[in-house]
Amino acid sequence: MKLTLKRKFIAVLALTSLLGACSLFKNERRFEPAKLADIKQSIVVNTVWQTSIGSGGSAGFAPVYADNSIFAATPDGTVVRVNAENGNIAWSTKLDTKLTSGVGVGDGLVIVTDRKAKAYALNAQTGEKVWDTELSTISTMPPIAGFGKVIVRADDFRVQAFDSKDGKLHWSFVRTNPILSLKTNSRMALINNAVIVAVPTGKLVSLNLNDGTVNWEIHSASAKGPSDIDSVTDVVGQPLVFNDGVCTSSYQGNITCYSIKNSRLTPVWFEPFSSAVGLGYDNNIIYGASIDGTVAAFSLANGQIAWSDQTLINRGLTNPVVYQNYLYVGDLDGLIHVYDTKSGSLVGRFSVGSSKDIVSPLLPTDKGVVVQNGSGTLMLIRAN
């Protein structure tokens, strides 16, 4: 039986409940979210603009910044293009279906997927539907588009490439399904006519966009125990891709960086760090938010830890992002926590206007940080 894990740390909680029933855990309170103490706020986080776009968010929904616009979607079928300067809605399209992921933006298209296992391509300028096509099964990973292809990774881990012009299937790539997998904010990346995508059991592959053949493959994490839950080692978040290397994070695994030369990968460093949300990056520093709520900064060159903070233990953190020397991370109570990137000190805290947890990944832009909160509000914030 295939089981998909739907919350960031549901695997940990499920394991705790199981063992707790067997009286092996006596201190289940260790999984309770940390209570927040007052902090001395040395910065002020302001809302530049906000607009209501639909019905909240989910793990498969990630806003995208392109052409001075924010593109986003919500589970109720709403897809929008918003002016990044002022939050005005350029267009809003309501599809007659329930969506499972979005958005992918590229080749003049905005791509979403639905519960009927279909992908929809909308015109990025007008919001009008261009084409739709059937998938192997539903997809809860945001699609990606570019170089004449639309790429979808379905929940059976099949990667499919469709023609951007008409939605015709070009190729399909699949690996054996694991018993358990983590349903979280994993995303793909496009570079040099290749798509980089996570596949089961802690692996990341680069596939040629022309025919789906494997350019290279890395193993970011390995199973560490005998149980099915121990075997969950999925690569999470969006891989950090550089001209000569790639860095990944994984659940029950590591942050791992590789150098790439002539399609050959050489491990540079790895650091044990279990995450469900992926990495942030700025100025040769990698930032991570772990499954237990640790926020840490690592040197890109060698993985040395610059600083680490455990103030936000078990608070269901989002991916960390950087804007103008501050690190932003969201939590399960709809709060944004702001760190000084140099010292690792918490310098600010901000409510996004909803007590629901922030599930969609934070999006850094050159204008601030975009947040899609749990109540369907899209907003741009920044610290002053």
UniProtKB/Swiss-Prot annotation:
Part of the Bam complex. One of its GO terms (cellular component) is cell outer membrane. A lipid is attached at C22 (S-diacylglycerol cysteine). Belongs to the BamB family. Residues 1-21 form the signal peptide. It is a lipid-anchor. A lipid is attached at C22 (N-palmitoyl cysteine). NCBIfam families: assembly_YfgL (TIGR03300). GO terms for biological process: Gram-negative-bacterium-type cell outer membrane assembly; protein insertion into membrane. The keyword Transcription does not apply. Gene3D superfamilies: YVTN repeat-like/Quinoprotein amine dehydrogenase. Keywords: Cell outer membrane, Lipoprotein, Membrane, Palmitate, Signal. This is Outer membrane protein assembly factor BamB. HAMAP family: OM_assembly_BamB. SUPFAM superfamilies: Quinoprotein alcohol dehydrogenase-like (SSF50998). Pfam families: PQQ_2.
